[in-house]
């Protein structure tokens, strides 16, 4: 038998080192049937500069083993039968601003008894500044002697492009959103 190691890596300028990410592991092996598939696996969770944590992960009603990891942690399932293929799915965290950079599957066999799958998420936060310059004598003042205009901004962060050669665009770590629109109306300055 061998092992299956799942590791979690976080990149970007706005990650939360205490955030837990959920993984669903489905193990398949020609030798498995409902009677022989294991109900639980021993797991070792490793993290730099901390003592290893030993725990157990049980198979749920869907036949999956559910684990949670923080950035920088690795969970290793022990005593995984040769010939086992692991399909690992990470829950979706895009609503929280985390982009899945990599996903993997892994197989434990006699050639790779210690299989590994690494999962990386990236989260970056930037600053959007809007400047309204009123020129001339026809500026309309509406609130307490202040000019009023509105704006809405739509930033699409799913598809980043490298614009290090382009000036005057908002960037995070030298990159800017591929799709960006700004519409200015009714904002008080």
For each predicted feature, which ranges?
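Solvent-exposed loop/turn and edge beta-strand elements of beta-rich ligand-binding domains
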Residues: 1-189
């Amino acid at each position: 038998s061998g092992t299956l190691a799942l590791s979690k890596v976080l990149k970007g300028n706005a990650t939360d080192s205490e955030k837990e990410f959920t993984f669903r592991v489905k193990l398949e092996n020609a030798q498995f049937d409902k009677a022989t598939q294991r109900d639980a696996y021993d797991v070792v969770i490793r993290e730099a500069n901390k003592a290893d944590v030993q725990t157990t992960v049980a198979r749920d009603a869907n036949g999956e083993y559910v684990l949670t990891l923080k950035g920088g942690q690795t969970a290793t399932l022990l005593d995984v039968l040769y010939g086992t293929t692991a399909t690992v799915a990470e829950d979706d965290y895009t609503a929280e601003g985390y982009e899945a950079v990599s996903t993997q599957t892994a197989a434990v066999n006699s050639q790779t008894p210690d299989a590994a799958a690494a999962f990386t998420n990236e989260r970056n936060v930037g600053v959007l500044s809007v400047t309204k310059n009123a020129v001339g004598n026809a500026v309309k003042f509406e609130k307490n002697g202040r000019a009023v205009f509105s704006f809405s901004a739509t930033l699409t962060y799913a598809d980043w492009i490298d614009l290090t050669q382009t000036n005057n665009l908002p960037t995070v770590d030298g990159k800017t959103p591929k799709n960006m629109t700004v519409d200015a109306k009714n904002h008080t300055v």
